[in-house]
Amino acid sequence: MTKNIGKITQIISAVVDVKFTNNGELPEILNALECYNDKQRIVLEVAQHIGDDTVRCIAMDSTEGLVRGVEVMDTGSPICIPVGTETLGRIMNVVGEPIDGKGDIKSSNISAIYKSAPDFTNQSTERNILVTGIKVVDLLAPYIKGGKIGLFGGAGVGKTVLIMELINNVAKAHGGYTVFAGVGERTREGNDLYHEMIDSGVIDLEKPENSKVALVYGQMNAPPGARARVALSGLTIAESFRDMNGGQDVLFFVDNIFRFTQAGSEVSALLGRIPSAVGYQPTLATDMGELQERITSTKHGSITSVQAIYVPADDLTDPAPATSFAHLDATTVLSRQIAEFGIYPAVDPLDSNSQVLDPMIVGEEHYSVARQVQQVLQTYKSLQDIIAILGMDELSEEDKLTVSRARKIQRFLSQPFHVAEVFTGSEGKFVNLADTIAGFKGLVEGKYDDLPEAAFYMVGTIDEAIEKAKILK
């Protein structure tokens, strides 16, 4: 078979035009092309056909130093990456090249990053709770095993810390495999996560086959093409783990889905497409749907996905986060107002929700306590204007009691994290679901009305709050 060779005719940032004149055959849309820039392999992905002999491509690596006239070869298939157990304990980039300095990834299994979602008949509809050990999440917006979970928040409210704590609490206790896709986030955070996983034993450097996690990075400094595709590369590895050996349960962490959308917007502008609302690509809903529909559970294995989603200017109606909402089973909304009070995790207990907060799934007691907690907090929120204008003295005795309980609940929703121990100096806490329900049930029923507010701040179980109250007295 003769190789289909073309030549670069134009380079504009991450967009490269390639002319094929040999036999008139143009590479298919989404095919991967290869060229070399100073002995470094660069992968280009076909995005458009221009005329009879030219294709417009998106570069997956920096185009600095690339010149017109360089030969480009059509690989005949989309971007393919190594999958399977050989990827465990390794860090790779969007095209499957190792970036951890540990040599090539010797995998006999290679898979294209574009696939169809499993058939409807093969998808699972089971709903089981995934206990995270984080009180506010487990009580008010519980996660689903095999579901899609979104962590929404503006800049600096704690999305990455929360995702790291979830990796710590869920991935370490989880028997199966974990895949982490770093999409357009800080290289330092990726490095911290890698070394933390080595320290905790999730990655075994001496025997990589004993590792439990594979990492795929396309960080902030990567070209838009890489950032737009790295989530698909990570998902391809997660799918391979899900389908191997008759089915596995896989955890798939993505930080950050907004950067995936942002990169798609950059690529779209470079390709000359007319932007839609707020400058996003006209294909925003399609791009999001193609990624999210593949993150699903089958009758044999599951993918539980936790996705951090940056909210520009704290506006949840922005098209990027708004497009994500429809695909998610549970949403955890992080609030700047709550972070300003020093309550961490800064999860908004009234904005966050979950499809499984249903008495048929979580049980009558859990559902009842969660709704009572939200009712107390909602009443307190509606009284805040009166308190601000007239003060606490003008409230009825019943309202004063509600405010007192709400403030205790707010503080009891805080929790010291394992991954933040070095910053807070407090030992991290994992709280079992039964302890969480029992603690909040006592609070809404008034069992702890005599304890000071400060006793409930940054503790795990209600017993710890009682002990703290004794010390404070």
From Swiss-Prot:
Stated family: Belongs to the ATPase alpha/beta chains family.
Binding positions (ATP): G153, G154, A155, G156, V157, G158, K159, T160
EC number(s) stated in the UniProt entry for this protein: 7.1.2.2
Keyword Cell inner membrane set for record: yes
Gene3D superfamilies found in the cross-reference section: 2.40.10.170, Bovine Mitochondrial F1-atpase, Atp Synthase Beta Chain, Chain D, domain 3, P-loop containing nucleotide triphosphate hydrolases
Keywords associated with the record: ATP synthesis, ATP-binding, Cell inner membrane, Cell membrane, CF(1), Hydrogen ion transport, Ion transport, Membrane, Nucleotide-binding, Translocase, Transport
Entry keyword rRNA-binding: no
Main function: Produces ATP from ADP in the presence of a proton gradient across the membrane. The catalytic sites are hosted primarily by the beta subunits.
Name the UniProt record assigns to this protein: ATP synthase subunit beta
The species this protein was found in: Rickettsia akari (strain Hartford)
Molecular-function annotations in GO: ATP binding; ATP hydrolysis activity; proton-transporting ATP synthase activity, rotational mechanism
Subunit structure: F-type ATPases have 2 components, CF(1) - the catalytic core - and CF(0) - the membrane proton channel. CF(1) has five subunits: alpha(3), beta(3), gamma(1), delta(1), epsilon(1). CF(0) has three main subunits: a(1), b(2) and c(9-12). The alpha and beta chains form an alternating ring which encloses part of the gamma chain. CF(1) is attached to CF(0) by a central stalk formed by the gamma and epsilon chains, while a peripheral stalk is formed by the delta and b chains.
HAMAP family, alphabetized: ATP_synth_beta_bact (MF_01347)
